[in-house]
Amino acid sequence: MKQAINNLKDYAELAQASYFYFDLLKDSNGIARKIYELDSKGNKIEDTSYPRGYKEVAISLEHIVSKEYRGQEALINLKQDDTWKSNLLNTLDEKTNFNQLNGEFNPLQVQNFAKRYKICFHQPNTKSGFSATLFSEKRKQKDTESKEIKYTNKYGYINYILAIISTESKEVV
């Protein structure tokens, strides 16, 4: 009975996580997207070595699921060549980018979730409102040196969980 209750809690957490925007991890070319790195007061850190003039970090699973980053803009990957066309496209992309992280997990949930699960596949919302995420659960193993029990994917995964959701359609199908 206790195991069944724990399984229900785990599945409820995965169901909640399936609504997060995992498609913001990478762009359509498979390149990691970024967010601005913030200081302890929540301000962007200036750094002229970055194209936008502020320090940027790659978006991780922890960023996606954490409520600490909720509402933070997921930056568009800029075109690197310095042609007028690329500069124009970069400017337009920046002005029309409304992608924001939408995580809701508290710090302990974030830590446990990131240790335990991996995102195998994510289908972002389609025009019909369909979305799906395939999670894999890592195995619990005892480390031979430290004797610590931790999650690992070294020997494969113990479960695959498919979360299918439906959101409001933006168009009539």
Residue ranges with predicted function:
Residues 1-173:
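Non-catalytic, mobile gating and regulatory segments of ester bond hydrolases
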